[in-house]
Amino acid sequence: MKGVKKTYDISYTLSFLLVFFVLILFRPAFSINTLSSTESLTISSNRTLVSPGNVFELGFFKTTSSSRWYLGIWYKKFPYRTYVWVANRDNPLSNDIGTLKISGNNLVLLDHSNKSVWSTNVTRGNERSPVVAELLDNGNFVMRDSNSNNASQFLWQSFDYPTDTLLPEMKLGYDLKTGLNRFLTSWRSSDDPSSGDYSYKLELRRLPEFYLSSGSFRLHRSGPWNGFRISGIPEDQKLSYMVYNFTENSEEAAYTFLMTNNSFYSRLTISSTGYFERLTWAPSSVVWNVFWSSPNHQCDMYRMCGPYSYCDVNTSPVCNCIQGFRPKNRQQWDLRIPTSGCIRRTRLSCSGDGFTRMKNMKLPETTMAIVHRSIGLKECEKRCLSDCNCTAFANADIRNRGTGCVIWTGELEDIRTYFADGQDLYVRLAAADLV
């Protein structure tokens, strides 16, 4: 019996040691999504943080054509690595020595000389609990007190500092309490995550709108939120497993979207070549599907046709004067150089004017617009007629047969027509030009 017990003890000890060494050797493979103030991530350790649902992973990476290293987040379980956030995109690590840790209640990324190349740079008072960093299930990398999971009390979050991608639950636009404007900036190239030439950014005005730009040159205007969607991207309403929202109040003006089916994935991305795209991934997918891309047609281009004209993909040429208007420069117009736009055939008289109804339109740029949220279309028409500077009006919200009022008091710019997904625009004309 003693021999049996001795053999059993040896076997038990060997089993214990085997399990112990397996745990040590393969520790990085376990799905750990938090980083405490006593831990660190290094390039050499190959350790990563993995979100609880195993969808997102945070760690160090380098692109195929570069020896520089970045800290980023990517989709974990897809066959092709897709990056959604990069911390040090404009200040990469020059070699394979890098450390992410919590120091002084901030996340810091240190290079080979222990110099900080990126930090959350949060200024706080006395701390009552240790700080912890966590990769959440939605891909948000947050820093919080270790005893608080309240999202409103996050000390810092990557969702506030997007790179080129908007994920579900992220917000694109302004936090009016802090003045933070969350916008997208493209990669320099498909293999270079540094800040590129293109941005997608919200501009605050009576009706906030997003602009796709290259530097100061605008390429595309989103159109305002119409209650269902961003009006200049009608394709976005056609995904049944997604809901969209634009919040505008005293605290924020921001767009977001949510997934209603967790089997599908979607993201908005601004490409290094200047396209704003929605990409989707279905359970049967092997690659990301480009659901829509903008600008997709010359009618998507910013101010393609000039003032008082509209773009129609079904006409040739695509630029057309609004009823009651004629080309301002006939020679240029005939040469298909439409940027000078159109002018009225008959001057407005103020007292005897009327309106032509244009259906399925992208509303004009709202720089010179006035918004009244509490009145309907009839009252909107009356107010437009009573203002001799009013050039057009429309509903601000197309839900419930239309509510709210938008009045334009200047030139009507950047208009286009859609097959079925736009909204009614009422343009002021002299009585002689009404049909």
Swiss-Prot record:
Glycans are attached at N46, N114, N121, N150, N245, N261, N389. CDD domains: B_lectin, PAN_AP_plant. The keyword Signal applies. Disulfide bonds join C380-C405, C388-C390. Residues 350-430 form the PAN domain. One of its GO terms (biological process) is rejection of self pollen. Stigma. Residues 34-156 form the Bulb-type lectin domain. It comes from the Eukaryota. Keywords: Disulfide bond, Glycoprotein, Self-incompatibility, Signal. InterPro entries: Bulb-type_lectin_dom, Bulb-type_lectin_dom_sf, Pan_app, S_locus_glycoprot_dom, SLSG/EP1. Residues 1-31 form the signal peptide. Involved in sporophytic self-incompatibility system (the inability of flowering plants to achieve self-fertilization). This is S-locus-specific glycoprotein S13.
